[in-house]
Amino acid sequence: MIDAACNYLNPYAQQHQAQQQQHAQHQQHAQQQQHHLHMQQAQHHLHLSHQQAQQQHMQHLTQQQQQQQQQQQQQQQQQQQQQQPQQQQHDFLSAAALLSAPPSLSGSSSGSSSGSSPLYGKPPMKLELPYPQASSTGTASPNSSIQSAPSSASVSPSIFPSPAQSFASISASPSTPTTTLAPPTTAAAGALAGSPTSSSPSSSAASAAAAAAAAAAAAADLGAAAVASAAYGWNTAYSGLGPARSQFPYAQYASDYYGNAVGMSSSAAWFSHQERLYQPWSSQSYPGFNFDDIAFQTQLQRRSVRCTCPNCTNEMSGLPPIVGPDERGRKQHICHIPGCERLYGKASHLKTHLRWHTGERPFLCLTCGKRFSRSDELQRHGRTHTNYRPYACPICSKKFSRSDHLSKHKKTHFKDKKSKKVLAAEAKEQAAAAIKLEKKEKKSGKPLTPPVEFKQEQPDTTPLVNYAPYANLYQHSTSAGSSVNPPPPPPPLFQQQMTTTTSSAAASFVEQPWSSSSSRAIQPATTSASSSSSSSASSPAAAVVSAIGSASSPAASATALAQHHYAALAMQSESQLAAEYGLTMSGLASGASQDSSSSCHMKSEYAASYPADFGAGTASYGYPHPHPHHHNAWAAAYHPHATA
């Protein structure tokens, strides 16, 4: 039973299965089986003689068949379509006759149905097997190299060739393409014997050519397997010898050129659209997409085709646009919803806006299931799940997931920026007024009313004590209030130099590395005592000179007071710049000296925290400052105290 099932599933073993079924019948009817075997052997020798005679007859007709080969293919296709339903009925009737025939009539029935029945006196497998039948010349049975005779209607082409098959087809004579064909041989034998179900003369000639191919393969000592594979010729060009290709599964993938000598009739192989394969698109095949029309359109027309807003529709129709271009010359796209009529410079922006009207939200968050109408909204929403914050504040290093949140946060750091600018402008105006007042004072030689002091950052009652960020301002502040807090006595050598400078009024030049004048440069001092005291506030020695000059005469004291206010104005203006931009404008780019500039960039609130005698009570005048601030004015910009 297992062998019978395997043979049933194998389309090329149906003859072997039929023999097994016949063997089961022989066990039931022993006498009929012996008689039938004798008749089959006699029929076997008869067919062998018919094949030899047909082979001789085919050699004379070979040249005529070469000229009419194309016509035979078309005729055989038509004959196949006509003979297939009739032949199926003949097979069914012959099988029924064989099953019901008595033993005495079995030989005659098998002989009469030799062109239609697959087996001689055996029930054909076509009644049981829906899968394609064996090849056109029968089975490769190991018992006999002479093939049995299935009818031309039950032929099913072998789609994929075997190596022996290909070798047998190559070993055949290439001069005659009919030698590679394998139509049924016994159909031709039945035609010559006068069988009522014989095929047309053209098919009989082709079958004789296949018999010649099998004989040539046998003569070439290829063995029984090569003879069987040559008889299994899988050429599907002669489709008239078998049923239609569309009846078999995967028949559309059977190639035209794999081992076939003639491949002209089966044009639908591989793909039904083979004529359009590897060819450019044409307007005939695709009428909705014409490249020829688009090629001559302008860029504006091609861009306008994709948008169907009222503005683009009017432009394509030749009408004037509803809304002209914007200030950049771009065309505007209008929302067609009544009452909205929003304008967009890009058609994609209008497309996303229309999703807001329709409520369409095609972008889905795979984490929480929320939907969005725009892809960037989905991208920003995804950062809430991943906690990705790429936007960092450069001042406080706080991070945000959106750039607009960062820009809004930055305003919290600079919310009083405008007031600082106003204060700096006021300080500059007051400094300019003080300069004008000083010039008038020099011309007239009389003390004028000192200018009104501006508002200081410290809430102290005495605004100039401990204010200025420079070290020499500490000395200048104590020299202004010398009656309350007198400075320490200078060294004796320094006192002699000071008295000599003020009494003789010689033409001596004093270097001023940190001058408080508007030029901010090194300037020589004049020979007058009043101008030497007015150009003070640069070194501790000059501060002491101004103190002695103020004690000697009331005019000199008034001059020192006015110059004291002017220096405070200049330093206040510079402190505003330091608070605004993080560095002072008076420092040298290469750095400053230690004795007067180490606290040049310090803000007033940090300077107020130092003790009152920070600069005044120091023993030496060229002291190094102990606080950890930088000596370079440009490096002060990166100090944490420098930014507001």
Curated annotation (Swiss-Prot):
Q: Which GO terms describe its biological process?
A: anterior head segmentation; cephalic furrow formation; imaginal disc-derived leg morphogenesis; negative regulation of transcription by RNA polymerase II; positive regulation of transcription by RNA polymerase II; posterior head segmentation; regulation of neuroblast proliferation; regulation of neuron differentiation
Instruction: Mark out the compositionally biased spans (Low complexity).
Output: 101-119, 140-196, 499-508, 521-537
Q: Where is this region: Disordered?
A: 16-65, 101-196, 437-461, 478-537
Q: Which UniProt keywords apply?
A: Activator, DNA-binding, Metal-binding, Nucleus, Repeat, Transcription, Transcription regulation, Zinc, Zinc-finger
Q: Specify the signal sequence span.
A: none
Check the record and name the Pfam families matching this protein: zf-C2H2
Alphabetical list of SUPFAM superfamilies matching this protein: beta-beta-alpha zinc fingers (SSF57667)
Query: Which compartments is it annotated to reside in?
Result: Nucleus
From the Swiss-Prot or TrEMBL record, give the protein name.
Transcription factor btd
Q: Which domain of life is it from?
A: Eukaryota
Annotated C2H2-type zinc fingers sit at: 333-357, 363-385, 391-413
Q: What does this protein do?
A: Required for the development of the antennal, intercalary and mandibular segments of the head.
The cross-references to Gene3D superfamilies, in alphabetical order and at most eight, read: Classic Zinc Finger
- Coiled-coil residue spans: none
Please provide, in alphabetical order, the Gene Ontology terms of the cellular component aspect for this entry: nucleus
Q: Which GO terms describe its molecular function?
A: DNA-binding transcription factor activity; DNA-binding transcription factor activity, RNA polymerase II-specific; RNA polymerase II cis-regulatory region sequence-specific DNA binding; sequence-specific DNA binding; TBP-class protein binding; zinc ion binding
Q: Give the encoding gene's name.
A: btd
